[in-house]
Amino acid sequence: DVCDSLVGGRCIHNGCYCERSAPNGNCCDTAGCTVLWWCPGTKFD
């Protein structure tokens, strides 16, 4: 899998959800960690 972003040194993949405290405030949808609104939970390797 290709990593979209790293949090705590862990890969975040397409379709993941990022926390508000994630670097750059990233959240994600199925296109990757790029959406501008917050989503619940996280999905790491």
UniProtKB/Swiss-Prot annotation:
The modification 6'-bromotryptophan is found at residues 37-38. Disulfide bonds join 3-16, 11-28, 18-33, 27-39. It is found in: Secreted. This is Mu-conotoxin-like Cal 12.1.2g. Keywords: Bromination, Disulfide bond, Hydroxylation, Ion channel impairing toxin, Neurotoxin, Secreted, Toxin. Mu-conotoxins block voltage-gated sodium channels. This toxin reversibly blocks voltage-gated sodium channel in cephalopods, with no alteration in the voltage dependence of sodium conductance or on the kinetics of inactivation. GO terms for cellular component: extracellular region. Expressed by the venom duct. The modification 4-hydroxyproline is found at residues 23, 40. It comes from the Eukaryota.
